[in-house]
Amino acid sequence: SYTGTLLSTNKQFKNDYPLSLFPSLFLTYKLNDKSDMQVNYSRKINRPNFFQLIPNFDVTDPQNILVGNPDLIPEFTNLAEISYQNQLSKKTSFLATAYYKNTNNLITNYQYRDKNPDPNAKPDTVLIISYANANTSYTFGLELTTKTKLTKWWDFTVNINLFNSALNAGAITGGRDNSQFSMFGKVNNSFTLPKNFSIQLSGDYQAKTILPPNSRGSGG
């Protein structure tokens, strides 16, 4: 649990977090010398950070004022994955992962227009950004990764993540349910240089999604 007092108004706030368990399971089955299957399950927690909890107005940007929410509770995520890995050749490997990720009480931000907290400032109403717990969110998809050693000094990796995500935000005033198919792709080049030097060049593409970037994938 945590407690706090906002000195400007002498307002006190308190929130109790229940005791929770976070089991994990990891199984591997070797199909042959070059390939194997893996099954993974885990439960994780993401607690709101200090700045998300403080009910104090941050007017650094007068047009976009931030305020925390002391009523935020942790979000809990259940993640299940099944993976297939194959060493296609001495130089090339392939990994495919199907996954399902469910989050309860997802911490998200939202905007609303309200009275300016500074009575001497203009305009009288401003856009305020705060945080709230959505009901639930889920993501399921397929992630494909291949790594190839093109030369002794050049490693080439491609990652493609195809997924569908949905968000139930009915707990937030003005919130609504939403779902969308999306994708993420990344290419990475790793070069080994003389005298133990190395360099990496990478690029990625993120299609439009309704969830934060760190919520898109298989949880890795």
Each model region followed by its residue ranges:
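Histidine- and/or cysteine-centered catalytic micro-motif in compact active-site loops
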Residues: Y99, N159-F163, S202-Q206
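Outer-membrane beta-barrel translocator domains and adjoining extracellular loop/strand segments
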Residues: Y2-K11, F50-N56, Q63-I65, L106-K115, ...
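One face of beta-strands
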Residues: P23, V158-I160, M183-N189
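C-terminal beta-barrel architecture of Gram-negative outer-membrane proteins
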Residues: L167, Q180-G220
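Structural signature of Gram-negative outer-membrane beta-barrels, strongest in the C-terminal barrel
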Residues: S1-T103, S190, P194-S202
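Outer-membrane beta-barrel transmembrane domain signature of Gram-negative proteins
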Residues: S1-G4, S8-D16, T28-K30, I129-T145, ...
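Outer membrane beta-barrel strand-and-loop segments of large Gram-negative receptors
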Residues: N69, I73, L95-D155, N159, ...
